């Protein structure tokens, strides 16, 4: 199965489980079973993250191996911090640094590859600012302003494009 097909399957599952485990399940701390399902969801999301980081490397390595390597490196480095956040919730802000970093080479390669509309790459850059803004806000003021989340919509646009539109074939 082609790399893009695998991404089209994994990305939406990753997104749905992420939304449930990061946004919804933590509000259910009083419902122990649902809370634990949310924690399990976070573990599953990180397993998907590993696969997606490696698939994105494979997808973009012909375009620019160095930038593709950065996708894999940053995508994988965020995993331990994300897992740590299951036990220490504030660790999520350390993971956000790597989430922001990984969107930069993805954005660069989206623009450079010709497989996707360039504007998506620019939205991914903006998304990286959202993650950096969340981390900086947390450490400087102790909370994350709600508007910072809107910056990360670029990542959602990327996931939706991959899922529904796929990638253009590049002729060598």
Task: Describe each PLM feature range.
Residues 1-172:
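Hydrophobic, aromatic-enriched alpha-helical segments typical of multi-pass transmembrane helices
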């Amino acid at each position: 199965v082609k790399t893009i097909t695998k991404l089209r399957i994994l990305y939406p599952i990753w997104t749905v489980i992420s939304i449930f485990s990061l946004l919804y399940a933590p509000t259910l701390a009083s419902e122990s079973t649902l809370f634990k399902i949310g924690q399990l969801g976070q573990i599953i999301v990180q397993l998907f993250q590993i696969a997606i980081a490696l698939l994105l490397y494979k997808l973009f390595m012909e375009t620019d191996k160095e930038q593709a390597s950065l996708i894999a490196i940053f995508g994988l480095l965020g995993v331990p911090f994300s897992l740590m956040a299951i036990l220490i919730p504030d660790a999520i802000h350390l993971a956000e640094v790597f989430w922001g970093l990984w969107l930069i080479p993805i954005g660069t390669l989206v623009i450079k590859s010709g497989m996707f509309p360039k504007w998506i790459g620019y939205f991914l850059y903006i998304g990286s600012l959202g993650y950096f803004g969340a981390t900086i806000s947390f450490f400087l003021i102790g909370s994350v302003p709600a508007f910072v989340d809107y910056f990360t919509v670029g990542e959602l646009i990327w996931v939706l494009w991959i899922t529904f539109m796929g990638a253009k074939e590049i002729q060598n």
